[in-house]
C-alpha cells in the first residue's frame, strides 16, 4: 500500500518517470479547512480511544485475557498509524510537497504497511482463538507467554513485508518543491512494483479476511444454528448469549475494517488497469475521500467495544468520568466483579434412549485472565444407563463447550 501519490500524475509520486515540476492540484481554502477538520477527528478519536482501550485491558487483571492481548496489539497499531501517518498523508495530498525529509519519507511508506499487517492479523488471531474456544473447547488454549510470542512474530513478519517499500523510498528535489517517491528497480512493465503491490494487497486484505470469514462462519453456525438437546438452565442460556455477543462484536470490527479499506486498495490497483485516470482533476478528491475512509478505520474499534461490551463500557465511563454528561458507572465491576462464577449445573442430555447426567463446571463469558488459575480439561467418562435412571453415574467435566468466554 502506497501512502503517497504518483509523480506521473503529479498527484502520486510513486515513480521517477514523467515527473511534473508544477503542482496542478491546488485546492481552495474552504476545501482544505473541511478536509483538515475531518482528518483531525480521526487523529483525536483514534489516539484517545485506542489508548483508553490499552489502559482498560492492561490496568485490570480481569481484562488480561488471550483475546484482549490481541486487541491491545490492534489498538497499538491503529493508534500509531493515526498519530504518525494520517496528518502527513493529508498535508502531502493537499499540497503535494514533501516537508518531512528523507528519513520520514521512508518511514511514511514503510510503517502503514506494517501497522496494517499487525492490525488485520491481530483480528485473525482473535478469530482463531474464538474458533478454537468454541469448536474445539477441550484443546489447549494459548498461554499469556505464547500470546506475546505470536504478537512478536506478527510484527516481525509485518516489518519484513513493509521493508521493500521503505527501502526504495526516496526524496527528489525539483525547482519548485520536494517530493517523496518510491523508486523501484527498473524492469519492463514495472514488474517489481506490480508484484509487490498485488502481494501486499493479498496478504494484508484478501487472505486474512478470507480466513476470518471462514472462522466466524463456522463459529456462527455453531452458536446460532446448533442446539444441544435436553434441559438447559438460565445460566446455560446466559453463557451462550455472552459468546454470541463477543463473536458479534468481533464480526462488526472485521466488517468495519473491510469496508473502510476496500476503496483504498481498489484506488491503488487502478493504475494497472487505467493509468490515465490519475490525470483527471477530480482524482485528488477521490484520493482524499478514500484515504479518509481508510484512516477512519483506526477510530471505530474503541466505539464498537464501548457500545457492544459491558466491561469496556465501564472502563470508558471511568476514563471519562470527569465529563459532566457521563456517569461513572460501577467501576468496581471492571476489576472485582468477575463473571467466572464457578457454578455446578446438572444438565440431562437425552439422546435416543440413553440418559446421561453430567455435572458441568459452568465458566464465565471470559477467557482466563493472565494471573488467574487455568482449568485443565479432563476426559469425559459418559456412562449410559440402558433402561433405568437409577443406574446412571454422575461425573464432573472440568472444561465444557460453554466455559471459554471472552470479555
Curated annotation (Swiss-Prot):
Disulphide linkage map: 105-180
Subcellular location per the Swiss-Prot or TrEMBL entry: Cell membrane
One GO CC term on file: postsynaptic membrane
Record's signal peptide: none
Pfam families named in the record: 7tm_1 (PF00001)
Major location (coarse): membrane
Cytoplasmic side: 55-64, 129-148, 220-248, 309-407
Transmembrane segments: 32-54, 65-86, 107-128, 149-169, 195-219, 249-270, 284-308
Lipid attachment, kind S-palmitoyl cysteine: 322
GO molecular function: substance P receptor activity
One example of a Gene Ontology biological process annotation: positive regulation of blood pressure
InterPro entries assigned to the protein according to its UniProt record, in alphabetical order: GPCR_Rhodpsn (IPR000276), GPCR_Rhodpsn_7TM (IPR017452), Neurokn_rcpt (IPR001681), NK1_rcpt (IPR000046)
Alphabetic keyword roster: Cell membrane, Disulfide bond, G-protein coupled receptor, Glycoprotein, Lipoprotein, Membrane, Palmitate, Receptor, Transducer, Transmembrane, Transmembrane helix
Domain of life: Eukaryota
Residues carrying covalently attached carbohydrate according to the record: 14, 18
Subunit field text: Interacts with ARRB1.
Job description of the protein: This is a receptor for the tachykinin neuropeptide substance P. It is probably associated with G proteins that activate a phosphatidylinositol-calcium second messenger system. The rank order of affinity of this receptor to tachykinins is: substance P > substance K > neuromedin K.
Protein name: Substance-P receptor
The gene coding this protein: Tacr1
Amino acid at each position: 500500500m502506497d501512502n503517497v501519490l504518483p509523480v506521473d500524475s503529479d498527484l502520486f509520486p510513486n515513480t521517477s518517470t514523467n515527473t511534473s515540476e508544477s503542482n496542478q492540484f491546488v485546492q481552495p481554502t474552504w476545501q482544505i479547512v473541511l478536509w483538515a477538520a475531518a482528518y483531525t477527528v480521526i487523529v483525536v478519536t483514534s489516539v484517545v480511544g485506542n489508548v483508553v482501550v490499552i489502559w482498560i485491558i492492561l490496568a485490570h487483571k480481569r481484562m488480561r485475557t488471550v483475546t484482549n492481548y490481541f486487541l491491545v496489539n490492534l489498538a497499538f497499531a491503529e493508534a500509531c498509524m493515526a498519530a504518525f501517518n494520517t496528518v502527513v498523508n493529508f498535508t502531502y495530498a493537499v499540497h503535494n510537497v514533501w516537508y518531512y525529509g528523507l528519513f520520514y519519507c521512508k518511514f511514511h511508506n514503510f510503517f502503514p504497511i506494517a501497522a496494517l499487517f499487525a492490525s488485520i492479523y491481530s483480528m485473525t488471531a482473535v478469530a482463531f482463538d474464538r474458533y478454537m474456544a468454541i469448536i474445539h473447547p477441550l484443546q489447549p488454549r494459548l498461554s499469556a507467554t505464547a500470546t506475546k510470542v505470536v504478537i512478536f512474530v506478527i510484527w516481525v513478519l509485518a516489518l519484513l513485508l513493509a521493508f521493500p517499500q521503505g527501502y526504495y523510498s526516496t526524496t527528489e528535489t525539483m525547482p519548485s518543491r520536494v517530493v517523496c517517491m518510491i523508486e523501484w528497480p527498473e524492469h519492463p512493465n514495472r514488474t517489481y512494483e506490480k508484484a509487490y503491490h498485488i502481494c501486499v494487497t493479498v496478504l494484508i486484505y484478501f487472505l486474512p479476511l478470507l480466513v476470518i470469514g471462514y472462522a466466524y462462519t463456522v463459529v456462527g453456525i455453531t452458536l446460532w444454528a446448533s442446539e444441544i438437546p435436553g434441559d438447559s438452565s438460565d445460566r446455560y442460556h446466559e453463557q451462550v448469549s455472552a459468546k454470541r455477543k463477543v463473536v458479534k462484536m468481533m464480526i462488526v470490527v472485521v466488517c468495519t475494517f473491510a469496508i473502510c479499506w476496500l476503496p483504498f486498495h481498489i484506488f491503488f490497483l487502478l493504475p494497472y488497469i487505467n493509468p490515465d485516470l490519475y490525470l483527471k482533476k477530480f482524482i485528488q478528491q477521490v484520493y482524499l475521500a478514500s484515504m479518509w475512509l481508510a484512516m477512519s478505520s483506526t477510530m471505530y474499534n474503541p466505539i464498537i467495544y464501548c457500545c457492544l461490551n459491558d466491561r469496556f463500557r465501564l472502563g470508558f465511563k471511568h476514563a471519562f468520568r470527569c465529563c459532566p454528561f457521563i456517569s461513572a458507572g460501577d467501576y468496581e465491576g471492571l476489576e472485582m466483579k468477575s463473571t467466572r462464577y464457578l457454578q455446578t449445573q446438572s444438565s440431562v442430555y437425552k439422546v435416543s434412549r440413553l440418559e446421561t447426567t453430567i455435572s458441568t463446571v459452568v465458566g464465565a463469558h471470559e477467557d482466563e485472565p493472565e494471573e488467574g488459575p487455568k482449568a485443565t480439561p479432563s476426559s469425559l467418562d459418559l456412562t449410559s444407563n440402558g433402561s433405568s435412571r437409577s443406574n446412571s453415574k454422575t461425573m464432573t467435566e472440568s472444561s465444557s463447550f460453554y466455559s471459554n468466554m471472552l470479555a
